[in-house]
Each structure stands twice: as C-alpha cells, then as structure tokens.
C-alpha cells in the first residue's frame, strides 16, 4: 500500500547546471569594477559640493545674514567681563575677619528668624538652632534656652560672646565652635562663642596670632570632615568643661 500511495514526481523544467556554476555566473555579471566605484563616488561628491556652494551663495545674499555679519564682534566683546570673581562675587571661603559678619553684626542663615540675635556687645553667630553665649548652653533646634539668659525679640541676649568676625558657611573667624576660644561653625549644627573672647570683656582675653587664609581654610576642611557624632562629643565635652553648673 505504501508503494501505491507514493506517485512518481516528474519535474519538467530541469537543468544540468549546478548551483555553484549558476551563482558564479550571477556574481560575474553583477560585480562592478573598482574604477567604476571610485568614479561614481567622485561624481556624487562633486554634485553635493555644487549644491553646498549654491546654498552658501544664497545664504550670503540674504539681508538678515548680511546684517548679522556686519555686527560680528570678537569673543571678548560678546562675553564682556572675563573676570570670574567679578561675575561670581566674593568667594565662599573668604577670610572671615569682617568679611561676612563684621563686629557686632548678626549672621542669619538657614531659616533663622529675621530678628536674629539682638542685644549683648559681641558678634553673634547663629546656625540652625541657636547658641548661648559664653559657652553656657546650646539651643538644639531652638527648643531650650540657657538659664540666666533673657530673650529679646526672638533671639538670645548674653553676657559675653564670640570674638570679632562672624562665621558663615565656608568661612572662619576669631571665635566660633571649637575648644577654648577658637574654632569654626560646621554644617548648620549651631555654635557657641569662644571662652571669654567678647571684645576683651570676658575671662582670659588672650592675644592670638593672625592666621593666613590658607591656614584658616585648612582648619575649616579638617573640621568639616568630622562626623556628626564626633562633633556632638566635642560639644558635650566643651560644655561640661566651660560651665559644669548646667549639668546639675
């Protein structure tokens, strides 16, 4: 039954040429010579360059383009001042002695009330939270006020304070956060004054050597590289050392 169900297939249009011969003949007929390829590419480039030249000529003849070419200025004339400091203003890491907050001027930063710190005779430097002067207490988040201190128009009134020159973001001055009368303000954590450096009215007002801008910047970088826990530990140690009565 299998032999009966498989009829014989007869192909009428057959050829004795092999596939290799057939494709070889097709390749010979279609392949152009390299000389023809180079000639065609040069012809296309010449046509494109002619079009570009015509387009450039048309653009030059336009009145708007001619007016723009007449007003052509040099790069310095168009840019104006090339001094970066003149355009950006005072650099952030400026020397702080009178640079950001002068003698007796408050610094207001990061959402502090407009009243700032009023009262007292020394420069008040305040960052996000507040400070008590003469190293008595730290107002964390503005929720606590040091004892023996009165409020005056939304600020703190103290007996001493940090020394000359306020501290802003990236600047240093004489009397900020730190140990015994020198240091910096870091990362908006609040600050306190150096011990007795309020214009020579406190305890132990000492003469300090004047530091250069590079030394102040190096101290600031070293301070800002410390972690929050390290700063809190230093602050607690300083508070316990300067005014042990607040721990009672």
From Swiss-Prot:
PTM remark: Asymmetrically methylated by PRMT1. Symmetrically methylated by PRMT5.
Organism of origin: Homo sapiens (Human)
Recorded superkingdom: Eukaryota
UniProt keyword list: Acetylation, Isopeptide bond, Methylation, mRNA transport, Nucleus, Phosphoprotein, RNA-binding, Transcription, Transcription regulation, Transport, Ubl conjugation
GO MF terms, alphabetically ordered: methyl-CpG binding; RNA binding
UniProt lineage: Eukaryota, Metazoa, Chordata, Craniata, Vertebrata
This protein's record includes keyword Plastid: no
Purpose of the protein: Plays an important role in the ligand-dependent activation of estrogen receptor target genes. May play a role in the silencing of fetal globin genes. Recruits the 5FMC complex to ZNF148, leading to desumoylation of ZNF148 and subsequent transactivation of ZNF148 target genes. Plays an important role in the tumorigenicity of glioblastoma cells. Binds to 5-hydroxymethylcytosine (5hmC) and associates with the methylosome complex containing PRMT1, PRMT5, MEP50 and ERH.
Pfam families with a match to the protein in the record: FoP_duplication
Quaternary data: Interacts with PRMT1 and PRMT5. Interacts with the 5FMC complex; the interaction is methylation-dependent. Interacts with FYTTD1, SET and PRC1 complex members CBX4, RNF2 and PHC2; the interactions are methylation-independent. Interacts with ZNF148. Component of the transcription/export (TREX) complex at least composed of ALYREF/THOC4, DDX39B, SARNP/CIP29, CHTOP and the THO subcomplex; TREX seems to have dynamic structure involving ATP-dependent remodeling; in the complex interacts (methylated) with ALYREF/THOC4 and with DDX39B in a methylation-independent manner.
Localization: Nucleus; Nucleus, Nucleolus; Nucleus, Nucleoplasm; Nucleus speckle
Phosphoserine, modified sites: 40, 49, 64
Gene (name only): CHTOP
Name of the featured protein: Chromatin target of PRMT1 protein
Free-text tissue specificity from the UniProt record: Expressed in an erythroid progenitor cell line derived from peripheral blood. Expressed in glioblastoma cells.
Any one biological process term the GO annotation gives: positive regulation of helicase activity
Ranges of biased composition (kind: Gly residues): 157-195
Keyword Glycosyltransferase in annotation: no
Segments carrying motif GAR motif: 194-203
InterPro entries found in the cross-reference section: CTOP_PRMT1, FoP_C
Residue segments, region Disordered: 151-204
Modified residues (N-acetylalanine): 2
Glycyl lysine isopeptide (Lys-Gly) (interchain with G-Cter in SUMO2) cross-link, renumbered residues: 70
Modified residues (Phosphothreonine): 33, 242
């Amino acid at each position: 039954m299998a032999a009966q169900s498989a009829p014989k297939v007869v192909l009428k249009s057959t050829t004795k040429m092999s596939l290799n011969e057939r494709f070889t003949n097709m390749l010979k007929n279609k392949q152009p010579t390299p000389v023809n390829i180079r000639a065609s590419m040069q012809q296309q480039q010449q046509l494109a360059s002619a079009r570009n030249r015509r387009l450039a000529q048309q653009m030059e003849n336009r009145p708007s383009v001619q007016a723009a070419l007449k007003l052509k200025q040099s790069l310095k004339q168009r840019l104006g001042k090339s001094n970066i400091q003149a355009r950006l203003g005072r650099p952030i890491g400026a020397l702080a002695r009178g640079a950001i907050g002068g003698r007796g001027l408050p610094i207001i930063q990061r959402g502090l009330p407009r009243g700032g710190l009023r009262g007292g005779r020394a420069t008040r430097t305040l960052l996000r939270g507040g400070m008590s002067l003469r190293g008595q207490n730290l107002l964390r988040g503005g929720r606590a006020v040091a004892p023996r201190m009165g409020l005056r128009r939304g600020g703190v009134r103290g007996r001493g304070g940090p020394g000359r020159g306020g501290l802003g973001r990236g600047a240093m001055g004489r009397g900020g956060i730190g140990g015994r009368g020198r240091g910096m303000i870091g990362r908006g954590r609040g600050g306190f004054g150096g011990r007795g450096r309020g214009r020579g009215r406190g305890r132990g007002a000492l003469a300090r050597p004047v530091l250069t801008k590079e030394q102040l910047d190096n101290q600031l970088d070293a301070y800002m590289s410390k972690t929050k826990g390290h700063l809190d530990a230093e602050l607690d140690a300083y508070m316990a050392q300067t005014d042990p009565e607040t721990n009672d």
